Amino acid sequence: MYLPENASRARLRQAENARSNRQEILTAWSQGQISRRDLIKLGLFTAAGTIILKSGLSPFAASADSTIPTGLPASPLFGVQPFTQPMPRLDLLARNAVSTLSPAPTAEANTTQQVLNPALEGVRPGDTGPIEGRPPGPIWAHQAFNQFFPQVAIEVTELGARTNTTYNPGVPSSLNSGINPAAPIPPRFHPSLPDQGPNAVWTYQGTFPPKLAQFRYGESALFRNHNGLPFSITQNGGFGRHTTSTHRHNGHHGAENDGFTGAFFFPGQFYDYHYPLTLAGFRTINPAATDPNAGGPADNGGIIKVPGDWHETMSSHWFHDHMFGFTSQNVYKGLAGMMNLYSAKDRGNEAINDGINLRLPSGTAKAWGNLDYDVNIMLADKAWNSNGQLAFDIFETDGFLGDVMTVNGAFKPFFEVERRKYRFRMLNAAVARFFTISLSDASPMIQIANDGNLLPNPVTLTQLDELGIAERYEIVIDFSRYPIGGKVWMVNLAEHEDGRRVANDLTLSQALSGTSPDPGVGRFLEFRIVRDPATPDQSQVPAVLIPNPDLSQVPVTRTRRFVFGDKGSQTTTDPVTSGRGPWGIGTDGGGQLNADFGRVSAAPKFGTREIWELVNDGGGWDHPIHVHFEESQILARNGSASNVPAWEKGRKDVFRLRPDGSVTITTQFRDFGGMFMEHCHNTTHEDNAMLLRWEIDDSGAPFVRPLPTPIPKPQGVTFQSPDDILPSAF
């Protein structure tokens, strides 16, 4: 997709002009000045939602004086070389008492009125609306709010890029590659690259690096998100939408806290997300909280016992925007962070040896949540324009690929390590790019978790499986094998030709050769071995981590089949709830439908277990499918249990279908009610429009059947009946 550095000036000029032309269209569309239907009428989009193959517009059309496609202009690096800046640890969010929140959190949405800013679309001078954007009333009230009343609060604000003067990596400078936390951090991908403008990048708190929240089981949390983005829809730097909805991927809680794509809120509002932080199955399994394996870490080194099944313990989540039709743009723009969960089994203290704590690499200074040797890594490919400002292109609906690799928001950094074991929590936060990761010397890595769930048993690998968008792999690397002064690199072997799928998984030597036309291939993170540890490494990787829940006594009540493909069509017309694009999902033998968050596609009964078959209907693409709400187990790949590799034998929430492939999963629907989602996490596919709504049926008052659809406006959320209910849903 991207032109090589030695491309002719004429091709570079044509490519830049074409991108500029596309950016004008993108700006008009993202700011609501023109609709997708208008683009089709003007002959700029096909009915399938792809850009017309037209010279001066499409990067894939021949130019006026050449039969060679113009391609995309490479992101300028302004002379910056790889591995010349330290990788920053993620920025730790402050944990405060709930009493510090004003106004205090409430079970139902806070409908206190405020005067609205007339720059908001559809707002007249003097209009008022609620201060909280959560839909009002009992259906969207926090479930189990009093049972799990919040004990800790984390408060964030979505803002445009600005300098970070309060950076908190959670570790001393010596364990953060020498970064001085007191030094201001400008909004740059490298110290020698330009500052990002306030509307080029939007992040939580408006600052670099991305944020990290620490939670523990047994300490319910209130996550208050303020929308501080520009009031005017036009102030977006050319892409992104200022209405947002925050998804905790993949939290087990009520739907009102899930970041439903249609429950978005506006600048000037906040939304309170309540995280019970207890274990799945808490209503029927270990309800008296007597099992010491089921719990969180106490401040004295002990355990806070919680109800639920300890086999459902999770370790790594992330949070990101889920705005309908704009998820790819908003997440790419910076609205994403990570969450670490600590438990009785995984306390973040490697010294506690009580027969329950697994003692994974972390540290020992604090009772729980040590980050010394527990490192978050957020991977994303980016691109920027000739001025160095973040750039995005919606017109390749196969999936946007960047040509610059970033780790924790930094262009190809280095990270200093000691000669001991480290745990790395790796997240693919890209739009469409997959990663296949190896170390440059092919040394072994121990995979301990998949999608935030510790595996039943660790798996030793020299090359990780493809890491799909939104998947999380946790690995342990032992750097004691290297001498002080040594270096080793993380390498990406997955070569893309477009955003549909990985074209080739290269050999390590091929990836290191520098000959791949894909700029995302090769070294992206340098480890520098700088010293021996000051104290002995007390961490371990036990042979048994967290076994899967026993489902043998849980009957299967229903099987459903979902087919994901490029034959999407739309049967509804509501401009707020319905999307359009080439991608769609077929349910139980029906046609592939574009997204409509007002359509009910499935409604499993509360307290039951189902089997879902997820099918990719083509060989030309891959889809990482995310099912919200509760972790699932993979029963089969392509119809056979023997095709499930060891690293997929734990619980998961993202399922790479692979070209022409299928994945059969089983899931329980318990504890909470409401409406949830299932979608492709190639967020370009999701936005164009591979997403469906499902809801939990018969979960008791106040829920009704079917649930009304929320329609957010600055003046308040209203409700309407579903646009459509598929015949096989209930």
Feature map (PLM): residue ranges:
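Intrinsically disordered, low-complexity segments enriched in small residues
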Residues: 30-33, 52-54, 316
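Histidine- and aromatic-rich segments of cupredoxin/plastocyanin-like copper-binding domains
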Residues: 250-279, 379-543, 548, 642
